[in-house]
Design a protein with these regions (language model features):
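Helix-loop-helix units of permease transmembrane domains in multi-pass membrane transporters
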Residues: 31, 35-67
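Junction motif at the cytosolic side of a transmembrane helix
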Residues: 113-117, 178-203
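Long, highly hydrophobic alpha-helical transmembrane signal-anchor segments
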Residues: 1-11, 102-106
Length: 203
């Protein structure tokens, strides 16, 4: 079946949305949230950042760096896939990339609160690894079964949200918008009150 779609740009864009979502969500968790936790636990932030303006500048700088990194990963992935399938990118491919960038910004800001959890670097790494695995598994399960608990979890599943938004003509549910709106507000508050002292310093 795959061989029948060589050179089919439209089919290819529909198939890669899940992978683009996985790559982008990985960057959000590990290049952004985990990095912020790591800088805090290493004592870097407490040593060099002493004001709320400094904290916001540090978080904003890491957000921009992670966004650039995610764009590079996505561009590389799409390039390799299109070359492998002998497909030519069109204007919709550019739109796909731009939409991915916009979703990444939303996800990074909305999930900033996770970096403020008072846990060690190793614990945060474990939490993020489990989280991305669960999100990916539930996303795969939803391809065959998307009822009950699986459906409700996938409403806020970041990878599923990427896939939904990258597909033309599909809209998010009001519950998704409400939940991520609340997460956005919580993340803004957590950025303003971001603790700079590492967890081990208070133990």
């Amino acid at each position: 079946e795959i061989e029948q779609h060589f050179g089919d740009t439209l089919w290819l864009k529909h198939q890669i949305s899940w992978f683009v979502g996985y790559i982008s969500f990985s960057v959000v968790l590990f290049n952004y949230c985990l990095y912020l936790t790591g800088r805090r636990e290493s004592g870097f932030i407490a040593t060099f950042v002493h004001s709320i303006e400094g904290r916001l500048l540090f978080i904003r700088s890491q957000l921009m760096a992670s966004l650039i990194m995610s764009v590079m990963y996505v561009l590389f992935f799409i390039t390799v896939v299109f070359i492998g399938f002998q497909a030519r990118p069109d204007y919709q491919t550019v739109i796909l990339i731009l939409k991915t960038i916009c979703i990444n910004v939303m996800m990074m800001i909305s999930l900033t609160f996770m970096a403020s959890f008072r846990v060690t670097f190793q614990t945060a790494s474990t939490i993020y690894s489990v989280l991305i695995t669960v999100c990916m598994v539930l996303g795969i399960v939803s391809l065959k079964y998307n009822d009950g608990l699986v459906y409700w979890i996938n409403i806020i599943n970041p990878i599923a949200i990427y896939s939904t938004l990258l597909q033309p003509g599909i809209e998010l549910s009001y519950i998704t918008i409400l939940v991520y709106g609340l997460m956005f507000i919580i993340s803004l508050i957590s950025a303003l009150t971001f603790k700079t002292e590492p967890v081990w310093s208070s133990q």
